[in-house]
Amino acid sequence: MNKDTRIAMLTRLRDENPAPTTELNFSTPFELLIAVLLSAQATDVGVNKATDKLYPVANTPKAILALGLDGLKSYIKTIGLFNTKAQNTLKTCQMLIDLHDGEVPAQRAALEALPGVGRKTANVVLNTAFGLLKDDQGQYFIAVDTHIQRLANRTGYAKGKTVEQTEQNIIKNTPRKTEFFFNLHHWFILHGRYTCVARKPKCGSCIVEDLCDFKEKTS
């Protein structure tokens, strides 16, 4: 896929969805952070069902800590790996209180120091909660999950054997300081979740099918 084709692909995704956002429900950076922590190996729908009950009761580090381990588990027990996620959530809440006055930091190193937070989660928070294109070290970033990894490689937009390689090649291939760069994460996730799915991609209804390098297209 060449530069012009990539721009055409992003243009179509933009025209279909001019203002994309995460499907996780949140109203504060803290709510987003916890939702993303809970979303590993879980669906956004499943996470939302849990947080829609949790957040009216506890949506701050102090309030979640007050629930205790068993109390928190009672809200998130429908989510996969809920035991580990509950422990990480409580540890994260304590660190936010001890180190950041209960606020979510907008610095990569501080985010990635939180239990259960890796590069992807930090990138989602920096982009979606704080509206950033670059981190505090001045480096551009894109949050890459399994959907984006699959879509970028399958379409030919950006190749990479690992999510880190794919992220760097997406950054290289995407015009910066534009709505394309800021919104690509959400466009690719949504397109990968609903159209360019893993097993049987819906090529027949794909708005970028004619631009895509995938050779095993389905009807």
Task: Tell where the protein language model's regions lie, with residue ranges.
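Catalytic cores of DNA base-excision repair glycosylases
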Residues: N2-S219
